[in-house]
Amino acid sequence: MGSLGAILKHPEDFYPLLKLKIAARHAEKQIPSEPHWAFCYSMLHKVSRSFGLVIQQLGPQLRDAVCIFYLVLRALDTVEDDTSISTEVKVPILMAFHRHIYDNDWHFSCGTKEYKVLMDEFHHVSNAFLDLGSGYKEAIEDITMRMGAGMAKFICKEVETIDDYDEYCHYVAGLVGLGLSKLFHASGAEDLATDSLSNSMGLFLQKTNIIRDYLEDINEIPKSRMFWPRQIWSKYVDKLEDLKYEENSAKAVQCLNDMVTDALVHAEDCLKYMSDLRGPAIFRFCAIPQIMAIGTLALCFNNTQVFRGVVKMRRGLTAKVIDQTKTMSDVYGAFFDFSCLLKSKVDNNDPNATKTLSRLEAIQKICKNSGALTTKRKSYIIENESGYNSTLIIILFIILAILYAYLSSNLPNSL
């Protein structure tokens, strides 16, 4: 639930962390009794605890459809990511994956850890998929077919240009946005969003992940697969792996900032997409990851640590985002706060400074024009001055820990 040191440094995080921990335990207890659905929801919590929590915002039928959609695409992604599989074997599987989901005898052993279990026991996912309504099944099949074909295309193709980068991100994430919009519409809860707005929702998340995961991806064994476009990185270094070497730090940061600036172009579309949502459950499901994305970009921007180790939002801030995100006003507030943080990190000598500032100012203008930026709102990044000394904070921590133990044992269904 976050380290003691982090909580002492940010005591305001404790209550959101407490609520998140209780919510996580509550979600894990909501596993269905049917074996195939029990497998799917258990696997969902293993492959993505955060997604497993966010999905609980949705109503039962839509939640089941989104759960299966997510697991099908994680399985597809596992095949794509396994660099030990030859191209001759991998491409036909990707191309035919949309048919395999109808076959409850099909499985293909690949991946590691929980992903290997997902692939070995894929018949459970197929059985659950077959339980879904026809509108949900058609949407999942269509997106799986298009994504598999796109992944197959890029198995044999490098990401050379920014257009290639956008196309790849469309296949692996933009289509997720389109698919979710179809599922929301099939549920009767939302109007069908435009493809361009849905695509931007996926691209904003995917580009953030590609930026954040540079070091993990470049060091992948036996062979790395990289998605930073040559059109961007070749302006700064001769080889993409050169960015991780300390002697290239200045150029690496400029390249990183170029990548972040490219990702920011999708933020305005994301704000438009979220502002059009009607249902509070679907809204929270969509909004929380988008706030996490702009928060992660703010941490990565101008930060050499991206090339040295892991850069991610602290768990307490993640808990705060999940706790505080209720309305579009909260989203405008978060995007404004994180764009302010980004703006404060822009070096005027950076070759992309003008473009970066222009994109940040466009985001800030939308947030200001919304009328949501009241003086009473809670900031995501400006910490309150604390009058507590360390002893009082520790006492508070002990009291809250006792409260957490009490709530966990006596109020499991209070959320």
Curated annotation (Swiss-Prot):
Belongs to the phytoene/squalene synthase family. Its EC number is 2.5.1.21. The chain crosses the membrane at residues 281-301, 392-412. It is an enzyme of class 2 (transferase). One of its GO terms (cellular component) is endoplasmic reticulum membrane. Its cofactor is Mg(2+); Mn(2+). One of its GO terms (molecular function) is squalene synthase [NAD(P)H] activity. It comes from the Eukaryota. The keyword Membrane applies. It is found in: Endoplasmic reticulum membrane. Induction: Induced methyl jasmonate (MeJA) in adventitious roots. This is Squalene synthase 11. NCBIfam families: squal_synth (TIGR01559). Its main location: endoplasmic reticulum. It comes from Panax ginseng (Korean ginseng). It holds the Pfam family SQS_PSY. The keyword Endoplasmic reticulum applies. It is a multi-pass membrane protein. It catalyses: 2 (2E,6E)-farnesyl diphosphate + NADH + H(+) = squalene + 2 diphosphate + NAD(+); 2 (2E,6E)-farnesyl diphosphate + NADPH + H(+) = squalene + 2 diphosphate + NADP(+). PANTHER family: FARNESYL-DIPHOSPHATE FARNESYLTRANSFERASE, SQUALENE SYNTHASE. One of its GO terms (biological process) is isoprenoid biosynthetic process. Pathway: Terpene metabolism; lanosterol biosynthesis; lanosterol from farnesyl diphosphate: step 1/3. Keywords: Endoplasmic reticulum, Isoprene biosynthesis, Membrane, Transferase, Transmembrane, Transmembrane helix. Component of the triterpene saponins (e.g. ginsenosides or panaxosides) and phytosterols biosynthetic pathways. Catalyzes the biosynthesis of squalene. The gene is SS11.
